[in-house]
């Protein structure tokens, strides 16, 4: 993940993660402070903002689709072609991995909290549609850019430190998140 330039669509975010990794190395070298560097894919799940403009991508799509359903809209617009593939991390998986990782004394390398499994934006949109009970059509607005075509994390280091780590099923995580937001939007 340190090879090459960070994709322009995540330039600030990606470079901040790299800077934190280097900062952790400095703390270890200068002050003997051990750190754990966990790298996450896109996260989603209950507890995030109810404002679709201030939340993560998948939660934002869930909120907007629930709003479209309540408004009786016949269409739901997704930006881009729907073809980019993204890996998603349910919030409970992140918390579980973080708690388990704190038991390690020192990790000199970053660990991806990834499954090496992704879903296209279109696939996730259709899962959300099913979970929400939205009866309208999903429309892809191709005047918006897609960003990087595939963002999936490797899992070899996660398997080394937490070989039995179990992830939530993506559709189950979406259903749980829809249930959380149904009464809030």
Q: What kind of region is each of these model predictions?
A:
Residues 53-56, 156:
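Short, hinge-like loop/turn segments at secondary-structure boundaries
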């Amino acid at each position: 993940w340190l090879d090459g330039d960070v994709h322009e669509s995540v330039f600030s975010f990606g470079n901040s993660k790299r800077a934190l990794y280097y900062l952790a190395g400095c703390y270890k070298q200068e002050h003997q402070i051990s750190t754990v560097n966990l790298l996450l894919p896109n996260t989603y799940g209950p507890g995030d903002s109810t404002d679709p403009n201030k939340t993560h991508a998948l939660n934002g799509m869930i909120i907007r689709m629930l709003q479209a359903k309540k408004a009786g809209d016949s269409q739901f617009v997704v930006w881009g072609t729907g073809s980019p593939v993204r890996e998603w991390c349910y919030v409970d998986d992140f918390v579980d991995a973080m708690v388990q990782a704190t038991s390690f004394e020192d990790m000199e390398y970053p660990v991806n909290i990834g499954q090496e499994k992704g879903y296209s934006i279109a696939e996730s949109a259709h899962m959300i549609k099913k979970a929400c009970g939205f009866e309208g059509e999903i429309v892809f607005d191709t005047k918006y850019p897609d960003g990087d075509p595939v963002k999936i994390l490797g899992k070899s280091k996660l398997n080394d430190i937490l070989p039995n780590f179990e992830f939530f099923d993506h559709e189950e995580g979406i259903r749980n998140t829809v249930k959380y937001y149904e009464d809030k939007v």
